[in-house]
């Protein structure tokens, strides 16, 4: 068992097995089975390249042998930072087959985050593309390696320069160690409201069950053609039902280099895409673009929208613009996933964020004193179930705060439940900014800013934004003369912070409002910036 992993209690695990939730299958088994069943059927389309299920299975075998030859062993962690390219699949399935654990980093992460992931996970390797969207990841790898000289294996998909070329690692398949379905399969990143992301351990058992239920709820089968427009390292496009759900169902995954309509719309037309997933800001962009373009999007049957709350007004436009069914998705990398059902009435689809996908999902809604609220009232969402984790990786202190004694996960979401068990998301309890689906931890950015010599104190809050839902505003108490906002943003970039974490607005103040117990009142700061924005709008 992976050290630092919190397993389900034996009694509950046995219940999930008896109920058929956990079928004893690994991801290696899953791909082998689909290769036998679907053979030459296309699994992955990337540009003009097509990989069949059989070819993907063979490549995973050969790459797993190469990883083992390199010295990567069962339970080793490997930071994988790959965009939407075909190599993503051979890499993760090779690691699954070997029993090594991918740690999924986002393409937008930079040296601060990647160095932390590699160090905290004690990574045996770091896998990157050569360059993507104008950014050279080999340069990033050099920065990371300069801070972590012990990181020896840097593997590159493409032109490797001084690093290891991914393609050269392919070797003759060998006998590999047995992987158990109860083993941790990979580590995902939490949204992170208390600084850098925590790592989320997902097992073969729990994650494959989540795929099975997603496939059933979303009506996927071998005729499904899914466009991966969002970065696949996110849990939502990975498994809700995402690319892995489509492979589970025997369908075809089409990779888009970006979610831009310029890239995505021609692919929908050419590949006859039937389903895709977006975050609300991108759904708005797509709807606006569709009115001025002539792409044939008639193959699209389902548009999923999740990652942040989608307004009812915008939700109502989807069917009129695209002629397809909207499916709202609300979930978390820690587990619980909710969907509106494809045959739900329109009022449920546009006004709720769905209901749990499994009959074994348990939910509680509590007030601030850990008491159940009355039906229909707003409160804190807690959950547990066969695919919701029991603890973060190597995070005892966080686990004590994030989980109840009986294993319910405190999601940090403020919700209310309808009579029919549908969830309406009202906001976040945690100090976290949801910038168009990308979660920004205020504390992480504040800590970086406090390293600037001209900054005495910093407090970052969300501010409303019509396009992204929320943007970030940081309030700064300067030491003497206030620095320029551009200087602070450049400072954060130099420290390797991802672009989406850079504050959208900087306000300089002499002091912060305080709560009754002497803490910074971020509620007052949010109100202050909202009022300022409103006043500016009225002018």
UniProtKB/Swiss-Prot annotation:
A Gene Ontology biological process annotation?
A: siderophore biosynthetic process
A Pfam family that this protein carries is: AMP-binding
Keywords from the named record: ATP-binding, Cytoplasm, Ligase, Nucleotide-binding
Q: What is its EC number?
A: 6.2.1.71
Keyword Transferase present in the record's keywords: the answer is no
Q: Does the keyword ATP-binding apply?
A: yes
Q: In which pathway does it act?
A: Siderophore biosynthesis; bacillibactin biosynthesis
Reactions catalysed, semicolon-separated, are: 2,3-dihydroxybenzoate + holo-[ACP] + ATP = 2,3-dihydroxybenzoyl-[ACP] + AMP + diphosphate
* Protein residues bound to ATP: 191, 307, 329, 413, 428, 519
Family matches, as Gene3D superfamilies = 3.30.300.30, 3.40.50.980, Luciferase, Domain 3
Q: Which residues bind substrate?
A: 234-235, 240, 519
What's the main place this protein lives? cytoplasm
Cell compartments where the protein resides: Cytoplasm
Residues in coiled coil: none
Molecular function, one GO term: 2,3-dihydroxybenzoate--[aryl-carrier protein] ligase
Q: Which GO terms describe its cellular component?
A: cytoplasm
Q: Function, please?
A: Involved in the biosynthesis of the catecholic siderophore bacillibactin. Catalyzes the activation of the carboxylate group of 2,3-dihydroxy-benzoate (DHB), via ATP-dependent PPi exchange reactions, to the acyladenylate.
Protein name, UniProt field: 2,3-dihydroxybenzoate-AMP ligase
Record the organism: Bacillus subtilis (strain 168)
The gene designation is dhbE
